[in-house]
Amino acid sequence: MTAETNTNKHPLYIPYAGYTLLELPLLNKGSAFTQEERSHFNLHGLIPHVIETIEEQSQRSYQQYGAFNDDINKHIYLRNIQDTNETLFYRLINDHLEEMMPIIYTPTVGEACQRFSDIYRRHRGIFISYPDREHIDDILQNVSKRNVKVIVITDGERILGLGDQGIGGMGIPIGKLSLYTACGGISPAYTLPITIDVGTNNQQLLNDPIYMGWRQPRISGDEYYEFIDQVLTGIRRRWPHALIQFEDFAQKNAMPLLTKYRDKFCCFNDDIQGTAAVSVGSLIAASRAAGKQLKDQTITFLGAGSAGCGIAEQIVAQMVAEGLTDAQARARVYMVDRFGLITENQPNLLDFQRKLAQKAEVVSDWGNVEEVISLLDVVKNAKPTVLIGVSGQPGLFTEEVIRTLAENCERPIVMPLSNPTSRVEALPSDVIQWTNGRALIATGSPFAPVNYQGKLYNISQCNNSYIFPGIGLGVIASGAKRVTDNMLMASSNALADCSPLLQNPNADLLPAIADIQDVSKRIAFKVAKAAIEDGVALNMSDEVLLQNIEKEFWKPKYRGYKRVPF
């Protein structure tokens, strides 16, 4: 079973017919089957008489979608279309991308994860549970997709800012892969969501009689890492060239897993590296628009977990690329967590935090600060020009913090990136008011435009969906065997090149969602070029590379079918 290419030049030869064909989401056309196809595939009477175009189907679906009043039911409705007719699903999403992205992914996907067992309808992807650890190869062989090229995998322990959702975390790989297709043109026949079920420490789920996961506390330590290794090794055997995206693993596991496997498999961690790439791309664009480089900015983070430190490390790398030494770059980055500013004399720092700790002598001249140096202390004394929130805690960018930030620079950059919307460090409307409209803002979740003193401010969403679809497309088009730091840096610079702010100082920081497919293609090209330069992809001309990108870019159109015997 495959719908791996999408062209009307050649028909697709398939053996399925009747109800079986209608039950295959990759192949089902519903009311769009032609008269000839209805005859050849035993479909007469199984669907209504009228033959519709995909445009007509999309219009009907959108009308039905509009009948739902709340976002979670809209999400359930769209997932039902996805599970019955994937081509129609992506046509509908493409027709209304900006409207529907918040429904199929953040913020609505957060509630969908919390209620996964409540709203479960139909199978999608695979669940690999710890009790089945002796049968991993069999589980992977049960997948009918032969040519999987992109996998998003989670263990459900740190879902957005919502914590441990057990197997409910499957909503994230499903949503992410929907965006790989809708934004990056990767055929749904090439994608596979995977959830690793190692139990849950969420007592509410353990007590829930309809929770569908393994009802045990999470395994940990060597037992956990050995199981993860079994899963990843099995994936490598089944689909040796697939890109693996790690998604929403807990901080204690995310960086060790990335460190262990990034030089063995073609893989990356979107929470660490994808978030970093889109954030750095946004900062490069904002700096260029002000006639500066990123190395001229001073940056303060609220949140020093794997995501925050991942962004910080990529900022340091970009500053070094712009001419600073490593030490000079690190001196311009301040990391604040729940224990205050991270300094070198603090105990119990994680390895990835220690490299970003500020020197003790830096803060010794700050005078009247408490032993725990607060975010406000850092903003007052370090005088940052950029404030980035990845804390998962709402409201911590207070009015005093933002007003103090705005005293130090003409156009402060404020990026409250925590997801979902309920976890954002500050509301864009408040930031605009507190800075008298001077702040450049990018958020992790979508927000409506803000009207302030008669001017409408669009709020750019610093969403990883600007980055990871292009990375996936670039990896596939080039045949890259690894995801290197240079490839990630290339994605940041490609995104910065697309910023409307570079043409108009009053424009938005990031491109419109409506343009995201073109952005993904540009990112794919730069990522693929970097892969070739790093020697992890075969050498090819720019012309061939561009042809590969266009060839791989799937569009939701129906193909003609011809029947063949089994």
Curated annotation (Swiss-Prot):
Keywords: Metal-binding, NAD, Oxidoreductase. The record marks 271 as: Important for activity. It is an enzyme of class 1 (oxidoreductase). InterPro entries: Aminoacid_DH-like_N_sf (IPR046346), Malic_enzyme_CS (IPR015884), Malic_N_dom (IPR012301), Malic_N_dom_sf (IPR037062), Malic_NAD-bd (IPR012302), Malic_OxRdtase (IPR001891), NAD(P)-bd_dom_sf (IPR036291), NAD_malic_enz_proteobac (IPR023667). Its cofactor is Mg(2+); Mn(2+). One of its GO terms (molecular function) is NAD binding. The active site is at residues 105, 176. Divalent metal cations. Prefers magnesium or manganese. NAD(+) binds at residues 158, 271, 419. A divalent metal cation binds at residues 247-248, 271. It catalyses: (S)-malate + NAD(+) = pyruvate + CO2 + NADH; oxaloacetate + H(+) = pyruvate + CO2. One of its GO terms (cellular component) is cytosol. It comes from the Bacteria. CDD domains: NAD_bind_1_malic_enz. Its EC number is 1.1.1.38. GO terms for biological process: malate metabolic process. Belongs to the malic enzymes family. Homotetramer. This is NAD-dependent malic enzyme. It comes from Acinetobacter baylyi (strain ATCC 33305 / BD413 / ADP1).
